[in-house]
A protein has these predicted regions:
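A structural signal for isolated positions on well-ordered beta-strands in alpha/beta enzyme cores
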Residues: 7, 35-37, 110, 157, ...
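Short, charged/polar "capping" segments at the starts of alpha-helices
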Residues: 44-47, 119-120, 166
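NAD(P)+-binding Rossmann beta1-loop-alpha1 motif at the extreme N-terminus of oxidoreductases
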Residues: 1-61
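Rossmann-like NAD(P)(H) cofactor-binding subdomain of soluble oxidoreductases
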Residues: 62-147
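Internal alpha-helical scaffold of NAD(P)-dependent oxidoreductase catalytic cores
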Residues: 26, 101-102, 125-130, 145-196, ...
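Short, well-ordered alpha-helices that flank and scaffold nucleotide-derived cofactor binding pockets
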Residues: 20, 24-28, 97-101, 124, ...
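Residues at the C-termini of beta-strands that transition into short coil/loop
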Residues: 40, 59, 72-74, 113, ...
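NAD(P)-dependent Rossmann-like dehydrogenase/reductase catalytic/cofactor-binding core
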Residues: 2-4, 34, 177, 228-323
Length: 323
């Protein structure tokens, strides 16, 4: 039986957790039915090469995960059977172009990023393989180079590729089960993806624009109103695209925010407030505007916030909040 070749591109909080569990199962231990390759860069890659990837979690304590190979160049790898792409949205195009030569007809591709149209973007650049729409729920981050700290067990939700409706990835189920990865398989994963997107995009845009935590947004009626307006714009787009969401999805999404610590910041908020060179602003605001235009849905609140955030990202300041 041939080994399954698994490649994890991006070893941040998400890739480090799921990739770490895969490597710990198949590369670090006696199970030799799969090779697990890591694609990373910089000091993080150097630390992984030197000491392995260390993953710390209340779920399993501390484990050291040694991949078959950790590299910066996908060109060094063999043909890949399973790609797990866990880069930031702004690095997706570069990652997908770099992996094209390692994608075969039956290669499985999961990219559980925060966007609503990730599979469509991948389809344009990869032009092959079986792309399984997916999203994740996890709290995890790089504590320092080579070390991942996680909270509760992460979960990945994925479903069938619309272009390959007869293909069910039973081998991937086996890999996840052996690695104790919590997953949920759906015939159609798009509702789950959009349910997450409606929450994360709206709160990301408002938190970044006003530089306010989730708790502060919920406490201020004016900010909460804008969050709900963006949610309704996304909901209308989803409806036009025949994505089946619960009628009460907006209320459910607002209630979900109350489950987070009040001082929670979004990653977009942190990136813009820290004036980082790159952010996922386009993944949230830009995507809503583009998809709204595509299906004929007006997105005035998103449009206003997105334009102002582009100014903020150019270091023009943060607006005052009233109400």
């Amino acid at each position: 039986m041939n080994k399954v070749n698994i490649c994890v591109i991006g070893l941040g909080g998400v890739g480090g957790y799921f990739g770490g569990k895969l490597a710990h199962t198949f590369s670090s231990n006696s199970d030799s039915s799969a090779n697990v390759f890591f694609v990373a860069r910089g000091r993080h890659l150097e630390a992984i090469r030197e000491k392995g990837l260390i993953v710390k979690s209340p779920e399993f304590g501390t484990i050291t995960c040694t991949p078959t190979l950790a590299t910066e160049r996908i060109s060094e790898l063999p043909q890949i059977d399973v790609f797990l792409i866990t880069v930031k949205g702004y690095d997706l195009t570069e990652a997908s172009i770099s992996m094209r030569d390692r994608v075969g007809e039956h290669t499985l591709i999961l990219a559980p990023l925060n966007g609503a149209d990730i599979q469509e973007k991948l389809r344009i650049t990869v032009q092959g393989g079986i792309i399984l729409p997916s999203c994740v729920y996890i709290s995890s981050y790089i504590e320092k180079p080579g070390v991942i700290q996680t909270g509760k067990p992460g979960k990945i939700i994925f479903g069938k590729d619309p272009l390959h409706p007869d293909d069910t990835p039973y081998e991937l189920f086996r890999l996840f089960q052996k690695s104790s990865i919590d997953y949920e398989w759906k015939e159609d994963a798009n509702p789950a993806i959009w349910e997450k997107y409606i929450f994360i995009a709206s709160f990301s845009l408002i938190s970044a624009y006003y530089n306010r935590t989730l708790g502060e947004i919920l406490e201020k009626p004016s900010l909460k109103k804008e969050v709900i307006a963006i949610m309704n714009e996304i909901k209308s787009i989803a409806s036009k695209k025949k994505i089946q969401l619960p009628d009460e999805i907006v209320d459910l999404s607002v209630k979900k925010a109350t489950l987070f610590p009040p001082d929670t910041q979004t990653s977009l908020q942190r990136d813009l407030s820290q004036k980082k060179d790159k952010s996922e602003l386009d993944l949230f605001g830009g995507t809503i505007l583009y998809l709204g235009k595509e299906v004929g849905i007006s997105t005035p609140t998103t449009g206003k916030i997105y334009q102002e955030l582009e100014k903020i990202s150019s270091s023009l300041g943060t607006p005052e909040v009233s109400g």
